């Protein structure tokens, strides 16, 4: 299983705020230098590398003399705008000592939700990697709104792994990995070395929240691993305080928790759909429709839909759930929620007589649908 790590050619590495700051007292240049040494070694070993770096808000808080992460959006954005410049300067300076360059990429959810912007971002990232530049990615905290937040950089890293078709996502954290119990309370807790990302038993052991400087706890890291798995990437959740951890991962040491995907790489359009987190509504399917999607790779027809929830327009993303409420798929709707309400449970031939026109015979076409 660890051959999936040593043989991975394209890595996305996510480093959290706690690993880049000196106990909340600004950026830790010494720690950043050690990370850079390891990432440069990966590049020289032929690994294509994309860095997702937290730390902008924490760096800005330090500059402003704040010791507690603010909850108000305007204060967070002010700290991010101040700290982002210092964060990028620090990475560029450190990589520059090894003759490498970095490029700043700031993303919002809209950049990945829009197909054209998604493709432009992917093209830019691939070009930078081909040029030997290390892209440094962060959420564009300064302009983002609650409605289009990724929520945490673990999720952003997973979507970037999807975007660049990475083989491996490395999420560096303040824990050594995922444990079968909370090691802070249970000295008998055992590290989970390997598991399937979709293993439901992991949910019970992924409790807890992020630290004072960051947003993501173990639950968000598990969720990120599952997002990355949709595009065929493996994920390592591993302690960032383990000495030379990236070097040792590349050498094949059995460290951290390796979460593996159920399926292989999806086609490019399906990758975009799988990583499209902003959903506008829900379609509740009957058992026959669930079977048609899962076993026969069929489109979703109106006759197989029992209920429409939410408000969405034609072309927006909807979630498809079975009678038990479990998500089956997600895809782009051919009809608005109002139109869908009128045609569900009906045959495709009846659409025109009900609506006065027929855009498509399917509610969601299979080319715009991805199983989850």
UniProtKB/Swiss-Prot annotation:
The keyword Transcription does not apply. GO terms for molecular function: ATP binding; glutamate 5-kinase activity; RNA binding. Substrate binds at residues 54, 141, 153. It is found in: Cytoplasm. GO terms for cellular component: cytosol. ATP binds at residues 14, 173-174. HAMAP family: ProB. Belongs to the glutamate 5-kinase family. This is Glutamate 5-kinase. It comes from Pseudomonas putida (strain ATCC 47054 / DSM 6125 / CFBP 8728 / NCIMB 11950 / KT2440).
